[in-house]
Amino acid sequence: SKYFAGYFNLSTLLSMSTSAYDGFYNLLSPSEKQLLLDNIRNIGNKFYNEYVNHLENRIADNHVWQMTFRILTMAAFATVGEIPEASVWADYCYNEWISRLPGLNKDGAWHNGDSYFHVNIRTLIEVPAFFSRISGFNFFADPWYNNNALYVIYQQPPFSKSGGHGNSHEGQRTPNGGRVGYADALAHRSE
């Protein structure tokens, strides 16, 4: 549909379909399951086909990491064994994560700005938490995460304005709930 143009809209549809399929699995009729699986397959294939041999060759493709990659990862693992391509997506997402993220450095900073850091915080917690859980390896042991706690504090200390690095971030007068929640989640993962 022309009304669902754009990757953020498609990723929202993929997320909703995956959440409904996974969360209501025992309540869905076979036709409802198939409808959701068809939607997951169509959007998942679209993302995968655009990422493979592209994403791994680009040093910065910021919109992918904000949400579409995370959502494809969750869709892949939720449908392994249900959609033939899902195991390929899962393998790709896992290997892409371990080869590229969380950062392209060890200092813990998000060099393209704090606003962009903020739109990535769900991915930066949810994907490594998921991979840590299924693999038994602590993905938060990466040097980037160890130093990221300092970045979160130094970029915007408690009760202060933001350092202003990033689109519109100079207007952040106090750390918002997302930043505080991220810091809390990071602290619990780094224990």
Q: How should each PLM-predicted stretch be described?
A:
Residues 147-191:
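Acidic/histidine-rich catalytic neighborhood
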